[in-house]
């Protein structure tokens, strides 16, 4: 699948390029050129790691399905203590989706535990070896989740900025 810039629809890149670059050269965001149709009923039968891999595979078509399955299984199995996407029964047919089972107890762990693996693989897919610096500005739990996710990732450093006051 190709991704295009929100500021130049003629600028198209692969998913690896979009992930490795972050923002387009003209400052736009990369968005998918289409939204794949998925069989929701089939997804309901999957555990969270398999569901995540199945959905992501539709968008990151230049990544191997085996890599995506392993990355999702490792991320949402270990870091989430087996409770990723846990639906806690409330009453009758009512459930609550618990999003705090990640390593920093922030819902942002869902993205920020997987994204470092995707970035490293994107750079590998593209033959890029330069160091990547991730800059994060936040006033909340995004910083801790990002720091935890990118901790000890080879070829990647991260700096988090918090406002004062």
Residue ranges and their predicted role:
Residues 1-165:
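PLP-dependent amino-acid enzyme catalytic core
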């Amino acid at each position: 699948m190709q991704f295009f810039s929100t500021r130049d629809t003629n600028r198209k890149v692969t998913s690896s390029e979009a992930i490795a670059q972050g923002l387009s050269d003209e400052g736009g965001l990369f968005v998918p050129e289409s939204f794949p149709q998925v069989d929701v009923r089939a997804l309901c039968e999957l555990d969270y790691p398999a569901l995540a891999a199945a959905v992501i595979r539709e968008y990151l078509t230049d990544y191997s399905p085996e890599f995506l399955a392993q990355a999702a299984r490792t991320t949402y199995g270990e870091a989430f203590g087996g409770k990723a996407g846990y639906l806690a029964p409330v009453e009758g047919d009512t459930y609550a989706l618990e999003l705090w089972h990640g390593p920093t107890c922030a819902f942002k762990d869902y993205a920020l535990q997987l994204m470092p693996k995707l970035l490293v693989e994107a750079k590998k897919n593209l033959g890029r070896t330069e160091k990547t610096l991730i800059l994060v500005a936040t006033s909340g739990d995004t910083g801790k989740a990002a720091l935890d996710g990118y901790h000890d990732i080879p070829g990647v450093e991260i700096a988090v900025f918090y406002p004062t006051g």
